[in-house]
Amino acid sequence: VGDRIKWVVATHTHLDHSPAVAPIAKATGAQVVGMPPADKLFQDTTFQPNWAMQHDDVIVSDDFHLRAIHTPGHVSNHLCFLLEEEGVLLAGDHIMNGSTVVIVPPSGDMKAYIESLQLLETYPLLKIAPAHGELMGQPLETLRWLVEHRLAREAKVIDKLAVNSSVNLATLVTQVYDDVDVSLHDYAQLSLLAHLIKLEKELRAKSVGE
């Protein structure tokens, strides 16, 4: 027998994350905490937080402080949570162990994702607890590698566009993600689109036609 569950925290509202929140809250009387979805694409539209947390909001108990860090990128309403006493980041889908995160526009935003990674570098992290995969050490090195990986992929996009500026998405993904198994190219194409949207916003690429 332990303490009563007081909060049920959702990092974001993708369908593999938040749908279980409501029945847990109903069974325990806990307060639902998280950001509501900003759109309906792949989102749990039934999610209704009692506390719509914002960046830097803190859950305070006698035993811990859990700080919300708004980390848009994977999806616009994504939050990471820092267990301050332990230096453990509950990373949701912002960081995965053994895989990079798929960025799905329009709610997924590559520029915001990279900036969110850089923001996390400013926090005193000791461990990263991803929603998918095991606990991760060396958080600063992990964050820096992820930023460098995305920027290296972006550089590859730019290089391929310099050779053929009118290439379509289906062809470009085979060139930019030639190190990734073909079976994953449908997912890679989504992140590639996110890279291209970022480059277009920065006036370094231009969409022509469909």
Predicted features and spans:
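C-terminal regulatory/interaction regions
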Residues: 159-210
